[in-house]
């Protein structure tokens, strides 16, 4: 004997549940008979909705990964100080941190070099200025990326996700959060400088 299809219609008039029973006598409370077409359409719609969400999430993750890579590349390009470029690869950052720690320990100068330049002794004041510039740069782009990632997670249209690019202007709460974080970081950096200069 063929099973009987049933459906449950919600307050909005949309089918919220479907199923099968052996006979009309076993229809669940609040349900009514449904056609085979209604039964199949319900599951097709659920499958389609799931597929769309899965695709959107995959596109978001891919875009976020791209933005992460762009963030790293942008940081590693470095900063300009006194007309010279200082790269900020992970090793470069470690080197600048080491110079800064040497200054904290009392060093008045420390050997280092700009991109394409020969090594020379940098004075403590220049090391401090380079360190501050480097930290501000890393903090800015890292915070910007984080806010951009949060913005991407709010997008519900695949085309909007695909349009996102690193360096685009943030808006609303995302820009406000970026500004707040940078203002806080600047205060902390100024406190460090003030203590070093006595």
Question: Which residues are covered by each model-predicted region?
Answer:
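A preference for well-ordered globular domain cores
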Residues: 2-4, 10-198
């Amino acid at each position: 004997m063929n099973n009987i299809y049933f459906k449950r219609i919600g307050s909005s008039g949309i089918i919220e549940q479907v199923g099968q029973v052996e006979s009309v006598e076993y229809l669940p409370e609040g349900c009514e008979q449904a056609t085979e077409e209604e039964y199949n359409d319900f599951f097709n719609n659920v499958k389609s909705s799931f597929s769309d969400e899965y695709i959107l999430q995959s596109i978001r993750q891919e875009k976020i990964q791209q933005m992460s890579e762009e963030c790293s590349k942008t940081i590693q390009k470095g900063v300009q100080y006194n007309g010279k470029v200082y790269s900020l690869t992970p090793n470069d950052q470690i080197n600048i941190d080491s110079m800064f720690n040497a200054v904290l320990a009392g060093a008045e100068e420390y050997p280092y070099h700009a991109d394409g330049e020969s090594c020379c002794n940098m004075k403590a004041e220049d090391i401090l200025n380079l360190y501050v510039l480097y930290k501000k740069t890393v903090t800015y782009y890292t915070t910007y990326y984080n806010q951009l990632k949060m913005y991407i997670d709010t997008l519900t249209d695949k085309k909007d996700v695909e349009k996102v690019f690193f360096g685009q202007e943030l808006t609303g709460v995302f820009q406000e959060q970026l500004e707040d974080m940078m203002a806080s970081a600047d205060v902390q950096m100024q406190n460090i400088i003030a203590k070093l200069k006595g």
